[in-house]
C-alpha cells in the first residue's frame, strides 16, 4: 500500500533532482555539428555511495556527460523513440519511475506506485512514443500487470493489462508493435521468493490492446525468465535466473522466434557455472549474442548461427549490454566500459561511474 509517508519521501527526493553536468554537454544532434564525444548515446543507472543513486547520460564510449539524482536505486531505463524523454525505473520491488529530458536534464514527471502495486524495474515506450508500458505487480500476489501511461496526459495511468502470469520482469517492444514480456513466475515478499516449488515462468506476447497473443515456456520450470532483447526482427533472446539446485548449471539463455519453440544456447556446465545462475543484460547483432553476469563477473558471446559459446571473458560486476551502431557496449560496476564488434576484438576504457544494472542506447 502506498502511504503518505512513501509519497512524501519520494517527492522530497525528487524536488532535489536536477541534472549535474559532468562534462561539457552538447544538446545539438550530430547533424547540427555536435561531436560524438559530447552527444548523448547511452543512459544507465549508477551507485554514488552512501545510499545515493543517479541516472547517468553518457557518450558513445560510456563517458559521463550529466547525471540526475534519483530517489532510490534504479534498474532499467526506457528511451522514447520520438522525443528526448527517458524513464528510469526503480529496482524491484520499486516505488517509482521518473521521466526526464536527457538533453536538457529537466525532470518531467515522478510517478509513484499505486495501491497494492510495485514496479519490476523495466518499461518500454510504444513505437510512436505516445504510451509508456511498465511491468508491475500486485504486491499481495505478484500477479503480473502491465501499466499503460499516456505521455501527452503527463504520464497518467490510463490502463492495465494482466492475465499473463506472476512476476513479470522485462518488457520490450517488437518491430510489429506488440509487447514481449519476460515472466519470471516467482511470487515474492519484498525480494524473498515464496513459490519456487510451483513457479510458472514464460515468455508472453501481448498486443498493444492487452490481448495475450502467445505464451511459450521452457522445459525447466526453475529457469525464471528475467531479461530480454530482440535481434531487430522476430527473434527474442531470453536471459534466465536459475532457481533450482545450487550445484546444477543449465543453459541460462534461449532464443524464440514467432511460431516456433525455444532454442537453448549452448555452453559446457563449467562455463555456465561462471555465470553463477544469473543473466543480467543481453544484446544481439546479426551474427552474435552477448550476455552479462554481475554475479559471475563475466560475459559471454554466442554465435547466433551455431548457438555455441565462442568467448567467455572476465569483467568485474559486468552489467549493461547494448548494441550501438553495430558494436556492443558493456558496462561494469567497477567503471570499465568495453567496446566489442565480434569475439576477441575489443577495447576497454575506464569511466568514473559505478554503473548499476542496465544500459539503454539512445
Predicted regions span which residues?
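Repeated scaffold domains used in trafficking and secretory/extracellular systems
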Residues: 73-79, 118-124, 166-172, 223-228, ...
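Surface loop/turn motifs at the tips and blade-to-blade linkers of beta-strand repeat domains
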Residues: 67-71, 111-115, 160-164, 217-221, ...
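Beta-propeller blade signature
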Residues: 146-150, 198-208, 251-258
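Blade-loop segments of beta-propeller domains
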Residues: 70-99, 105-125
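Short, conserved, GDST-rich strand-edge loop motifs in beta-rich repeat architectures
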Residues: 135-138, 181-199, 239-249
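N-terminal export signals
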Residues: 1-5, 9-30
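Asp-box/WD-like beta-propeller blade repeats and closely related beta-sheet repeat scaffolds
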Residues: 116-122, 135-174
